[in-house]
Swiss-Prot record:
Main enzyme class: hydrolase
Protein's gene: dapE
Protein name (database record): Succinyl-diaminopimelate desuccinylase
Record keywords, A-Z: Amino-acid biosynthesis, Cobalt, Diaminopimelate biosynthesis, Hydrolase, Lysine biosynthesis, Metal-binding, Zinc
Similarity comment: family membership: Belongs to the peptidase M20A family. DapE subfamily.
Residues noted as binding Zn(2+) 1 in the record, renumbered to the chain: H74, D107, E171
Length: 387
């Protein structure tokens, strides 16, 4: 049997592409060459949006029947920061002391490399065809505005008649060690700006003004003090976090006309975006009474809450993890948002990849042994899925 590329070699090829969003820098070419060589039909699709950069995306599929397992992810990376601070070049793909260094090693070129390596090995051992379909849905627009990537690629695929049964997103889901966590959902995210209007005036004549600063402080305290909920079966309690307070006033002898406070809410499945906004607005109105003039400017958000209920698919992935690592993974919904929120509208989706401890950091790195383990886990998923 012909040997197939290792996850390490694929990851190194990807890391050597400096694909800081929106640049692709050849990363999708690496995947296209490998997948075409294994018999996949590969599509490259570019999406545009006014005011944003054009983004190249890749969709590849082999097989045309169900069940259909999709591997999803992104080849774009965040900027490396101070290049001189890296022990090894951010885009060199160096291995030292058993560790693979590079921007994207963990988030998430390493995970993509493992999925590709596992798939190529599975196909080579099974006559070149799955008993169903395998696809790769890869974007170059996840780390920035995320408007010309996965969300549009899914719409494009649906318009072509593509139907997914299950999906694994190779985001770095593990906290401490390979196999400790499967992400089965994510909280929603909604940001806003609390605005309190006052009346500008001289600090020596406060009776002629209305200071919004004490009022916004009271409102911040009120909105922070009462929990939005107490959590649910799969999620921790929703959390409202104020992140800045601004009055735009450089003077010390002028009462400002307005005060603004930015905030973000990470919310669970007790809420939708609309019911959440209504709840916060209701509490704000009660706190303002008839005296304080305040309102909220809600910022656009496409980060809805989602959860894949534990069941046959999570059990299958968990069994593959246990076989390789001996661990029973925790089913978790913590952390920030990811493109899985878009995929959840089309099929059941979980996130399982490498350990996330060094993602976005200087000297981002992963043990080569973790690449081998993750490849073996994905290989076990494929074997079980198409049994």
């Amino acid at each position: 049997m012909t040997s197939t590329p290792t996850a390490l070699s694929i990851a190194q090829d990807l890391l050597r592409c400096p694909s800081v969003t929106p640049a692709d820098a050849g990363a999708l070419d690496v995947l296209e060459t490998l997948l075409k060589g294994a018999g996949f039909t590969v599509h490259r699709v570019t999406f545009s949006e006014p005011g944003t950069a054009d983004i190249d995306n890749l969709y590849a599929r082999i097989g045309n029947t169900s069940p259909h397992l999709c591997f999803a992810g992104h080849t774009d990376v965040v900027p490396p920061g101070d290049a001189s601070a890296w022990t090894h070049g951010a885009f060199a793909g160096d291995v030292a002391d058993g560790l693979l260094y590079g921007r994207g090693a963990v988030d998430m070129k390493g995970g993509i490399a493992c999925a590709v390596a596992a798939t190529l090995d599975y196909l080579a051992a099974n006559g070149g065809q799955p008993k169903g379909s395998i696809s790769f849905l890869i974007t170059g627009d996840e780390e920035d505005v995320a408007v010309n990537g996965t969300v549009k690629l899914l719409q494009w695929a649906a318009e072509r008649g593509e139907q997914f049964d299950h999906c694994i997103v190779g985001e770095p889901s593990n906290v401490e060690t390979i196999g400790d966590t499967i992400k089965i959902g994510r909280r929603g995210s909604q940001s806003g700006v609390l605005i309190v209007d006052g009346v500008q005036g001289h600090v020596a004549y406060p009776h002629r003004a209305a200071n919004p600063v004490p009022d916004i402080a009271r409102l911040i305290t009120t909105l922070n003090d009462e929990p939005l909920d107490h959590g649910s079966a799969q999620f921790q309690p929703s959390n409202l976090e104020f992140t800045s307070v601004d009055v735009g006033n450089p003077a010390t002898n002028v009462i400002p006309a307005q005060a603004r406070a930015k905030f973000n809410i990470r919310f669970n499945d007790h809420h939708t975006q609309e019911t959440l906004k209504a709840l916060v607005e209701q509490r704000l109105a009660a706190a303002c009474g008839n005296r304080i003039r305040a309102h909220i400017e809600w910022l656009p958000s496409n980060a809805d809450v989602f959860v894949t209920k534990p069941g046959a698919f999570t059990d299958l992935v968990g069994a593959a993890i246990a076989e390789v690592t001996g661990r029973t993974p925790e089913l978790n919904t913590g952390g920030g948002t990811s493109d899985a929120r878009f995929i959840a509208k089309y099929c059941q989706v979980v996130e399982f990849g490498l350990v996330g401890q060094t993602m976005h950091q200087i000297d981002e790195r992963t043990p080569v042994s973790d690449l081998d383990k993750l490849t073996a886990i994905y290989r076990g998923v494929l074997q079980r899925y198409f049994a």
